[in-house]
């Protein structure tokens, strides 16, 4: 999690080729779980799901929706979105059921159960935008039901499992309006234009394959043998799949080149949902990884350059999850328990090393400059220092679902990435620049792979065997231990030192302190009174209490304040600007130029030229 593209050809495209075989003919004689999801005749914003039951030899059985799903690291309780749960025998008689907890139903007379049915509510329209770790489900892990327009099917929000039957094959039939098309990495085995049929080997495979139904807007391309599909839902049509494909192709080509032979994935799908940010739309932005897909949710109002930058950062992160945890993971992940999860100790690797790769590949492949990369690492140090720097990372990881560890989760993208960076530098130093952390991950992938998980307690020893004693000592001291990382020591090995320079900051925010607020009744944006304003306000003679009506002739209010803040991040020193305000009941038009506020920021620079070879091996090796 990080926690976020051509015209439909008649009958056949890369991901929509449909053989003439019928769904019925394809169903195996082996016992299966057959699921039907109806995206037609949607009533009260709910979707009907029917699940056929296998044979049971017990008097009762349970059916559960997930409490948690892989990659989210939060309790989400998808059962709370289920209504009108019923069980039937093969004559259509309703069987007695009861609720065990929010996610689980007990079905009596299990020997006679033929199917269960229920209605699914979506998650997008109940989000409050309260952020990670709250009651909100992270949007990329959520669901959307917008009849005849869009259905975001993260399968864990629609399909559950019978106790002890998760390993049976799942066959899923989805009926949908003819005007909508489902973007997914799965292969549709039904030739109908209103029914899709998908076969998966087990429940875990099903929930790792999201489908997004909308008016067809997608592109496909091939990069080094990998088939890639980019599917987009943009409510207003502002963004199209074709408009973002060149940058996505450049990025994914660079990623494939960076990974080399470590990557064997044959298909990959990026599902981009753009939110209107209305009261009933998604508000959690980012992405969620799957082995062969990524679901991405972003605000539709983003400027194209901002959208592309965000897409590159979050999609590249999710794509690198094909290394870990897809190819390298523990038993806790391989045999994931959706309702009584045991968490792995190695989030530093699953999320941290992945985040490091998502930044390293960009400098390695020439997508960003060295200065950009150093700035990103400096920001991660700043953010990590604001967290609990003595909490053992392995302890936090194993207990991430509960406090006080839960509140430290976001550090996996900060200190976790820095752990990966330090390991990379150590390995480069000890191997005279010949190898780095990517080589380590390739060895681990060869040792384990998709179907062979490792034991949590054995990973450090295995890594040490594949690398050097210094790597093992670092892991024990700074990852399993309480000792903060001396970043200066590791930067010095590649000629990098700390520097301080003035950097422009946002005109509307100083850290977490805003300079503006909103009148909840009038929805007007107000400059906060009785605080010291920065140079931007002083230069334009803006005062506390002024109501911001428009900037550069574009009106702003609560409805589009996010867009205003986003656009402000593109302003340059000296840009011409006009601000329409209301002061003491009278409207005024202020004209002037942008004067950005600056703050002293601790940065990083390459200063020791004697270490140029080591630095080049680290960043370009």
Task: Identify the residue ranges that each predicted region occupies.
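Non-catalytic architectural context of zinc metalloproteases
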Residues: 75-84, 88, 92-265, 283-286
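An active-site-proximal "capping" alpha-helix that borders the catalytic cofactor pocket
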Residues: 85, 255, 349-361
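C-terminal recognition in membrane/secretory proteostasis and scaffolding
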Residues: 358-359, 367-621
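N-terminal, post-signal-peptide region of Sec/Tat-exported proteins
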Residues: 53-89
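Sec-dependent N-terminal signal peptides
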Residues: 4-12
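C-terminal motif of bacterial Sec signal peptides marking the signal peptidase cleavage site
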Residues: 15-16
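Juxtacatalytic substrate-recognition/specificity segment
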Residues: 219-346
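Early extracytoplasmic/domain-onset interaction patches
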Residues: 24-68, 154
């Amino acid at each position: 999690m990080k926690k976020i593209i051509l015209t439909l050809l008649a009958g056949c495209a890369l991901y929509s080729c449909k053989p003439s075989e019928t769904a019925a003919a394809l169903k195996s004689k082996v016992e299966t779980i057959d699921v039907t999801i109806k995206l037609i005749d949607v009533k009260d914003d709910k979707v009907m799901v029917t699940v056929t039951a296998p044979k049971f030899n017990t008097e009762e059985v349970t059916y559960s929706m997930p409490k948690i799903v892989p990659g989210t690291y939060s309790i989400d309780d998808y059962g709370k979105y289920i209504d009108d749960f019923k069980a039937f025998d093969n004559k259509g008689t309703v069987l007695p059921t009861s609720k065990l907890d929010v996610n689980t139903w007990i079905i009596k007379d299990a020997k006679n159960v033929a199917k269960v049915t229920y209605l699914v509510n979506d998650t997008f329209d109940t989000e409050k935008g309260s952020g990670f770790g709250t009651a909100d489900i992270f949007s990329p892990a959520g669901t959307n039901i917008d009849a005849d327009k869009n259905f975001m099917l993260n399968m864990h929000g629609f399909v559950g499992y019978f106790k002890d039957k998760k390993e049976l094959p799942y066959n899923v039939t989805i009926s949908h309006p003819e005007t909508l098309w489902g973007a997914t990495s799965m292969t549709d085995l039904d030739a109908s234009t209103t029914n899709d049929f998908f076969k998966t080997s087990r429940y875990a495979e099903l929930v790792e394959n999201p489908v997004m139904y909308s008016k067809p807007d997608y592109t496909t391309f091939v990069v080094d043998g990998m088939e890639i599909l980019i599917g987009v839902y943009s409510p207003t049509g502002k963004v199209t799949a074709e408009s973002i494909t060149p940058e996505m192709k450049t990025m994914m080509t660079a990623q494939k080149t960076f990974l080399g032979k470590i990557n064997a994935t044959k298909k990959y799908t990026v599902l981009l949902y753009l939110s209107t940010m209305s009261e009933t739309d998604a508000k959690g932005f980012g992405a969620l990884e799957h082995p062969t897909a990524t679901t991405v949710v972003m605000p539709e109002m983003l400027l194209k350059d901002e959208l592309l930058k965000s897409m590159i950062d979050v999609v590249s992160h999710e794509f690198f999850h094909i290394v870990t945890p897809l190819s390298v993971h523990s038993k806790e992940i391989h045999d994931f328990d959706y309702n009584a999860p045991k968490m792995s100790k190695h989030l530093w690797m699953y999320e941290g090393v992945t985040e490091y790769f998502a930044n390293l590949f960009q400098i390695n492949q020439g997508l960003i400059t060295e200065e950009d990369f150093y700035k990103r690492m400096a920001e991660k140090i700043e953010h990590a220092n604001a967290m609990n720097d003595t909490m053992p990372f392995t302890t936090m990881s194993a207990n991430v679902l509960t406090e006080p560890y839960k509140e430290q989760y976001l550090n996996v993208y900060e200190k976790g990435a820095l752990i990966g960076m330090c390991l990379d530098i150590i390995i480069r130093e000890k191997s005279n620049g010949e190898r780095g952390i990517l080589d380590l991950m390739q060895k681990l992938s060869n040792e384990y792979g998709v179907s062979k998980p490792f034991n949590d307690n054995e990973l450090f020893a295995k890594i040490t065997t594949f690398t050097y004693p210094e790597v093992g000592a670092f892991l024990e001291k700074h990852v399993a231990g309480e000792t903060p990382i001396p970043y200066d020591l590791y930067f010095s090995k590649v000629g990098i030192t700390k520097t301080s320079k003035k950097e422009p900051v946002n005109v509307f925010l100083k850290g977490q302190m805003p300079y503006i607020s909103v009148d909840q009744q009038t929805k007007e944006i107000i400059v906060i009174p009785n605080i010291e304003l920065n140079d931007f306000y002083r230069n334009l003679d803006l005062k506390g209490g002024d109501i911001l009506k428009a900037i550069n002739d574009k009106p702003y209010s609560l409805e589009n304040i996010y867009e205003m803040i986003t656009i402000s991040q593109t302003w340059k020193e000296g840009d011409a600007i006009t601000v329409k305000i209301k002061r003491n009941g009278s409207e005024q038009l202020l004209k002037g130029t942008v004067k950005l506020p600056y703050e002293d920021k601790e940065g990083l620079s390459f200063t020791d030229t004697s270490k140029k070879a080591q630095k080049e091996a680290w960043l370009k090796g």
